[in-house]
Amino acid sequence: MEHYIWLSMAFIFIGVYISKFLAHKTNTVDVLWFIIIGAVLGNFHLVKESHALEFLGDIGIILVMFALGFEEDAKAFVDGVKKAWGIALIGAIFPFIAGYYSAILFGFSQNSALIWGLTMTATAVSLTMMTLKSLNLHKTKAATGIMTSAVVDDVLSLIGVAILLPIILSGGDTGNLTINYTELSITFAKVIIFFVTVYLVGRFVLPHDNGLQKLFKLENGQYAVLGIFVIVFLFGAFAHLLGFHPAIGAYFAGLLLKEEYLQLGQDKFYNIKSVEDIIHNLAFVIFGPVFFILLGTKIIFDVNILGEVILPTIVLFLSVLIFQIISAGGAAKFTGGYSNKDSILIGLGMLGRAELAFIVINIAYVQNQLITQQEFYILVFTTFLLNISVPLLIKAYTPFYNKMKD
């Protein structure tokens, strides 16, 4: 049935066109329309699930994160990390609490409550950063705070998965609650190895840029993009090897690559501007949108079960939304020293739920049947609503942000 893959890709790219058009006509962000169009394509069975499509979506998000990292100022990022710990920690704990007690409120088991809480922790930074970019806010202090906090949040979420899933799988409701300290120690070791390696590469390897410039200047710079791809996928592979999403590695690849490495000269066939344009088009026009449209296709509406999940979904959505904005925004203000306007933007920017949410849902429902079909829809719909609220709320807040003083 290979023809379905090609047909699905055609519908996806048609969806990208429609999304871009609607975003322009309605003066809204295209990420919102990617998800909506994806939901339409999925419910009308115009895009079928495929490992090949998922792989293309993964490539898209990797390129998006690299492009965003490349546009980031490394020094600003390091300064931002110093402010990020409170935002990430507090901004992860409170959504977990909201998810946990929402499940308890509706009479679900402790296992379910842990799954609900864990699903609500990891932040979908790529969704937020694409939204900020479309509004020309991606180089603000708040954007740096969101990105750095989300990286730390991703680490905390991985640790949460390492701790809680073994507890749940070992029979949490029977009272046999045990923490696998071996797995937890391994996770901490991987975190340390990843960041130490990134630091060493950025501090001692890449500054000796002669080799990179020779690579990028081959054939008058025609292979510069290919050279970038090599570096991006090496970083992505290393991150994946240690249990991170490859997009995290790609972001750091972009962060560590400096523009001077691509100063190929105006007389060359390719210069830094043309290379940046190619990367931008691949990331934000071709492959990146594939990821977000596929994200939308995961929302399959079933009329029979919709009535049962409306109230729990609304309660979970509102509780996470309120807890996330207040906790992340408050932490940004009081632990990170951000201004009021940046703190609010950070609170809004931390709302989206990341791929880890769908991974947890998949493990809990598809692989281990730890949650019911009703819970599956509640978590998927809530994740969708949170993701779709990010561009809407940031778009609505942008005029106030631009008017407010630092």
Positions of predicted regions on the chain:
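Structural signature of hydrophobic alpha-helical transmembrane segments
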Residues: 1-11, 51-66, 110-125, 186-197, ...
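Transmembrane alpha-helical segments of multi-pass membrane transport proteins and ion-pumping complexes
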Residues: 12-20, 35, 39, 43, ...
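Transmembrane alpha-helices that form the ion-translocation and gating core
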Residues: 22, 86-138, 201-205, 295-401
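Membrane-interface junctions of multi-pass transporters
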Residues: 22-26, 40-83, 208, 212-220, ...
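Multi-pass alpha-helical transmembrane bundle typical of ion/small-solute transporters
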Residues: 25, 70, 164-224, 240-244, ...
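Juxtamembrane helix-boundary/capping and inter-helix hinge elements in multi-pass membrane proteins
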Residues: 28, 70-82, 106-111, 131-144, ...
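Small-residue-rich segments of transmembrane alpha-helices in multi-pass membrane proteins
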Residues: 32-44, 86-100, 148-164, 217-235, ...
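Transmembrane helix-loop junctions at the membrane interface of multipass transporters and ion channels
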Residues: 160-180, 236-241, 298-308, 360-373
